[in-house]
């Protein structure tokens, strides 16, 4: 059995896009927390200009499956024009 995988992703929205980025991430979180192998998928407002997503996955395989999933594809599409 492999060790859990921990990740942090930092999101810096374009000017005026903070709340749209936060909403897109919150929508994704609602889907991702129920994915197999997801231990933690939590959003934090690090500053008024930066959001941090903290993830923990049971295994490399679970993370890889998540990375190819529809929730990540939808999130990437939603964020494509909103990030600095």
Question: Predicted regions span which residues?
Answer:
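Short, well-ordered beta-strand segments in beta-rich or mixed alpha/beta enzyme
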Residues: 5-11, 39-67
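An amphipathic, aromatic/His-enriched active-site/gating alpha helix that lines ligand/cofactor pockets
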Residues: 27, 31-39, 56-84
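Hydrophobic aliphatic residue packing
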Residues: 5, 21, 29-32
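Short, surface-exposed ligand-recognition loops at beta-strand->loop->(often short) alpha-helix junctions
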Residues: 10-22
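Noncatalytic linker/hinge segments flanking ATPase motor cores
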Residues: 17, 47-54, 80-84
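Basic/polar N-terminal segments that are highly enriched at the extreme N-terminus
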Residues: 1-2
């Amino acid at each position: 059995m492999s060790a859990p995988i921990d990740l942090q992703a930092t999101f810096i929205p374009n000017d005026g896009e903070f709340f749209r980025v936060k909403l897109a991430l919150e929508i994704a979180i609602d889907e991702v927390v129920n994915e197999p192998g997801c231990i933690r998928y939590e959003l934090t407002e690090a500053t008024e200009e930066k959001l941090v997503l903290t993830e923990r996955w049971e295994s490399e395989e679970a993370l890889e499956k998540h990375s190819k999933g529809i929730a990540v594809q939808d999130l990437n599409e939603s964020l494509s024009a909103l990030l600095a």
